[in-house]
Amino acid sequence: MNQYVIAIDQGTTSSRAIVFDHAGNIVSTGQMEHEQIFPQAGWVEHNPAEIWNNTREVIGSALSKANLTRHDIAAVGITNQRETAVVWDKNTGEAVYNAIVWQDTRTQSIVDELAQDGGPERFKQKVGLPLATYFSGTKIKWILDNVDGARERAEAGDLLFGNTDAWVLWNLTGGVDGGVHVTDVTNASRTLFMDLETLQWDQEILDIFGVPASMMPAIKSSSEVYGHVHTSQLLRETPVAGILGDQQAATFGQAAFQPGEAKNTYGTGCFLIFNTGEEIVHSKNGLLTTLGYKLGDAKPHYALEGSIAVTGSLIQWLRDNLGMISSAPEVEELAAGVRDNGGVYIVPAFSGLFAPYWRADARGAIVGLTRFANKGHIARAALEATAFQTREVLDAVNADSGVPLTELKVDGGMVANEALMQFQADILGVPVVRPKVVETTALGAAYAAGLAVGFWKDLGELSANWNEDKRWEPQLPAEEQERQLRLWKKAVTKSMDWVDEDVK
């Protein structure tokens, strides 16, 4: 009966449920967008109740489209936007504040305060991450410090924290009626609180942040049965057996299981993950050290990650804020109407610059404008910004690993854009490879869940599912590639040193 696995993909802009068959093919999908809440400049929030309601809806939608019931589903996997922090009351099931999203920069003052003693890399050796607004830890502290009564309730043991994986899991397994409060190692590695070696919360760091340990979910592997769906839900009694943060899930879905393998996901942001195997590699080039995956009792696999805050969301900004396009695919048509970028470069530092710079004082800049520049040049510069940022991250990966990547596996929504993929190959100087199933994030979560219940027997079986769809070879002459890179790097410097006491 159990011929399928369902993955819940709780992303930055939408929540989806995708049903996969044994060959890793998509059977059906349910998807709902949720509201992006911007209370003030630099603040980004989601409504946790809306996310949970949408999750329930999309599960129903995916099942009904394929005419399936819970009896057809072997296991549930969860993947999620990482670092987005939810704090809720375990007695009522209600969030005490909106989810603070990974792009949110309101916690910069907390980062600055904590960095006074030991600098931004104060905890990096232990947790693999620099102090930055990006990670969950500063967001939890902000909620405890700023929401009336939150600290007292947390210290009394009434509040729970989770990234959205833990929020969805807790609700799926019963919520106030016995909900399981668990996260996996990949999500835990994005909080600033997990020791990379012990895979446990670090009490000393929790104390420094003023976060009670009672709030934190238990840390489990990425592939094991955490609990079963509550009897009040459509999927009742189905095991929930896989959790991976979205970028780690995409790496797993790309079958990048071996050291030296890597993928780049093109979504709201861009995230390049390079598998370092069982070795913890500390970056000297602005990358994060993170968990790749941990399967049950097996040893964990670690990874280096280059996180880019703004790529796909730059196209959304052209659509929603500027009204330059009415749908995201239009950007490719506009860009195709011009021969090159017309000397225009966009540095989309809306949340500062992430890897490899980690500059919170940067803000977005469009440089090289002349009267010659038109909408097509702006559209092309927006697409090229994604490729340039990826090149800088790949350079950092090559420097840290000492082993230059020979090709880049890609996935995510933007890989449908063929002009971007060709330019990406041109600016990297290595082939870019797209798999047949580009929903690798959901697929990775499905794989983790399916492995735990024996739906798939081993990693070899998963690797056999991976198939190439298309490959782009670099075509740009080396000297032109270098000229464009120099201009890009010059543009990046123009975005820095913007935020100071005059900038509200």
UniProtKB/Swiss-Prot annotation:
Pfam families: FGGY_C, FGGY_N. GO terms for cellular component: cytosol. Sn-glycerol 3-phosphate binds at residues 12, 82-83, 134, 246. One of its GO terms (molecular function) is glycerol kinase activity. It comes from the Bacteria. Inhibited by fructose 1,6-bisphosphate (FBP). The keyword Kinase applies. Glycerol binds at residues 82-83, 134, 246-247. ADP binds at residues 12, 16, 268, 312, 413, 417. Its EC number is 2.7.1.30. Pathway: Polyol metabolism; glycerol degradation via glycerol kinase pathway; sn-glycerol 3-phosphate from glycerol: step 1/1. InterPro entries: ATPase_NBD (IPR043129), Carb_kinase_FGGY (IPR000577), Carb_kinase_FGGY_CS (IPR018483), FGGY_C (IPR018485), FGGY_N (IPR018484), Glycerol_kin (IPR005999). Belongs to the FGGY kinase family. This is Glycerol kinase. It comes from Paenarthrobacter aurescens (strain TC1).
